[in-house]
Each structure stands twice: as C-alpha cells, then as structure tokens.
Amino acid sequence: MDFKQYSPEELKECSMIEVVHSVLGDKRQATTFNELVQEIAQVLGLSQEQVNAKIAQFYTDLNIDGRFINLGENRWGLRSWYPYEQIDEEILPQPKPKKKRKVEDDGFDDYIEEDEDFDDADVTEDEDDDVEDLDKVLEDEDGDDDDLDDLDEDEDDFAEEELEYDETEEEEEEL
C-alpha cells in the first residue's frame, strides 16, 4: 500500500495495526518490532514522545490481533505467510548439541540382572518374621481404640457431674 497517496488527515485516521499490516505485506519478510515502530512513526508522522506513549498499547494489539505472529527473537510477520506446520518449526528454539562426556571407570563392576534368578524358595525366615511383626502392630492399634473409648466415657461422666453441680448451685442461689 502506498501511503503517499493518502492525505495527512487520512493517515492520522489509520491505526498503527493497519499500517503495520500494510508495511509487512509490502516487505514480505519478517521484521523486528523496533523496525516496525520506526516505520509506523515515519508513515504516521509521530514524534518520539507520541510513539513512547502508544508503544505499550501497540505491542498488546499486535499480540492480540490474529493476523500477526511472533517468530521469536522479537521478529514479527504475517500469519498468512506460514503454514501451521512451519510455524511450529520456526517458533521452537533449536536445541544445542550436548557435549559428550568421557566415560570414566567408577571402580565398580557393572551389575547384570540376568545373572540373578529369584525363586519362591529364596524367601527367608526374615520375611515371615516381618509378617508376624505386622500382626503385632495391628493388635496394638486395636488396643489404642479401646483407650479412646475409655476417654469418651470419662468425658461423658464429667459432663454429667458438671450438670448436677450447676443445678445444685442454682438452688442454693435461690435460697
């Protein structure tokens, strides 16, 4: 779009987003955000102060508008230029190849699982003792429940005694 054909009044009515869309369409290549801002300022005749006042809203509008895409490294382009599959490839950062480390001998022999064969016959008496110990623990926990029941009964008895005391106290006050 040739902006020279528009009068200054018509250019002032154009939004920054419309100008960027036209600029990118004419260039046909991705451009950095700073270059886009400079071109907008030049086309619309904005001072540096005006640009600074509008730059935050412009960046927000650029992100929200679906016609534009951020290609990383602060480069912007038109979404219509990139098929969906290519967008993913451009946006994703390229992984850096990792340096290979020298394998050092740690002083231990490598353990191979295939050498060991475990059967049910390998079960030791220690495992049977563990089961018996677990049974004892469970029995002890049942005993703890009995202690809680005793506490509940004690609380009930205390509450009844307190009620009886309150009644006798009130009778004495009435006299």
Swiss-Prot record:
Transmembrane segments: none annotated. Residues 106-175 have a biased composition (Acidic residues). Pfam families: HARE-HTH. One of its GO terms (molecular function) is DNA-directed RNA polymerase activity. Keywords: DNA-directed RNA polymerase, Nucleotidyltransferase, Transcription, Transferase. Residues 91-175 are annotated as: Disordered. The keyword NADP does not apply. GO terms for biological process: DNA-templated transcription; regulation of DNA-templated transcription. Residues 14-81 form the HTH HARE-type domain. InterPro entries: Asxl_HARE-HTH, RNAP_delta_N_dom_sf, RpoE. It comes from the Bacteria. Belongs to the RpoE family. Participates in both the initiation and recycling phases of transcription. In the presence of the delta subunit, RNAP displays an increased specificity of transcription, a decreased affinity for nucleic acids, and an increased efficiency of RNA synthesis because of enhanced recycling. RNAP is composed of a core of 2 alpha, a beta and a beta' subunits. The core is associated with a delta subunit and one of several sigma factors. This is Probable DNA-directed RNA polymerase subunit delta. It comes from Bacillus anthracis. The gene is rpoE.
